[in-house]
Amino acid sequence: MSAQFHMDPETYLDAIRAEISRYDELQDATIDAIPFAPRGVLELGVGTGETTRRLLERHPDAEVTGLDSQPEMVFHAREHGIAVRLARMQDPLPDGPWDLVISVLSVHHLDADGKRDLFRRVREQSRAFVMGDVVAADPQVTPLEEGVDLPSAAEDMAEWCGGEIVWRADDLAVIRAVYD
């Protein structure tokens, strides 16, 4: 995915929709995959807060804490009332336990070892994990930036997190793992 829009919260949604034509389907499928009404939610890569907004529409009693590594996105999300911390997915996760850890279009930035490590830490601190992301596919529909976008096969990620693929379209997938 092109880096030019990653830092600008004002243009991010339009740009991501231009690059990923099924972006809204991915978001909807991710929210649909939530296995229960969560209370404590950790979102990895909160960005503009779009996933949090959609989650709260469906689960208004949820309390969401977000993480993002981009200061511009953290500032934007905070301006819109989202509790978000400046942190990378490689950093220790905020203390759980969490009912749900959720992520949309963030995990593909980690290499395979980074993904396995993240999934191990998520499993230790949560009841469930739902992820919607770009996955390795042939053909690769989503434009990728070399060295930045590192998609893995959906089947591998499902195995690594102890989950299952619950939705797939082109080179996008939603994976859900329930741990309790």
What kind of region is each of these model predictions?
Residues 102:
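A conserved beta-strand element that flanks and buttresses the S-adenosyl-L-methionine
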Residues 130-174:
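C-terminal alpha-helical "lid/dimerization" subdomain adjacent to the S-adenosyl-L-methionine
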Residues 44, 48-91:
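Class I SAM-dependent methyltransferase SAM/SAH-binding core
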Residues 6-24:
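Class I SAM-dependent methyltransferase Rossmann-like catalytic core
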Residues 110-121:
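A short, conserved alpha-helix within the catalytic core of class I
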Residues 175-180:
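C-terminal lobe and adjacent flexible extensions of AdoMet/dcAdoMet transferase-like proteins
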Residues 106:
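Hydrophobic adenine-recognition pocket in adenosine-nucleotide-binding enzymes
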Residues 21-37:
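Conserved alpha-helix/loop element of class I SAM-dependent methyltransferases that forms part
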